[in-house]
Amino acid sequence: MLVPGRRPQALPSLCFCILVLACVVACQQEVPAATPSMPPELVDSPWSLMKDKVKTLVTRTREKWQWFWGPEAFQGFVQAYYEDHLKDLRLRTQAWLRSSRDSLLNKAHSLCPQLLCRDGDKN
């Protein structure tokens, strides 16, 4: 089957994308909404203690990194980036344009035959 207006090479990629999308939708429908509870035989096992420790670790890590996701951290990053890279951009750009122009004029003058370009024609 060819899709009108599409190349035949794109068809396998399209089929793969549709297959992946169908699998994702099917998997989402099979997952129950409630979180399953632990079986009674595992409640007193070392695995339940591990679950509590992991939950505590995740909570502490989330609290410690909360500053990173706040607006102050992003504003500080943007300010530091501006000061390090963009503050003197206008001056650097002007200097680069001047040096590029001078270099280009020098190259053009060196390629010019002596009969056509005299010393008075440099400007």
Curated annotation (Swiss-Prot):
Subcellular location(s) of the protein: Secreted
GO biological process terms, semicolon-separated: lipid transport; positive regulation of triglyceride storage; triglyceride homeostasis
GO cellular component terms, semicolon-separated: high-density lipoprotein particle; very-low-density lipoprotein particle
Pfam families: APOC4
Keyword set includes Metal-binding: no
Major place of residence: secreted
Keywords: Lipid transport, Secreted, Signal, Transport
InterPro entries reported in the protein's UniProt record: APOC4
Record flagged with keyword Endoplasmic reticulum: no
Region forming the signal peptide: 1-27
Record-linked PANTHER family: APOLIPOPROTEIN C-IV (PTHR32288:SF0)
Family classification: Belongs to the apolipoprotein C4 family.
Function: May participate in lipoprotein metabolism.
Protein name (database record): Apolipoprotein C-IV
Gene that this polypeptide is encoded by: APOC4
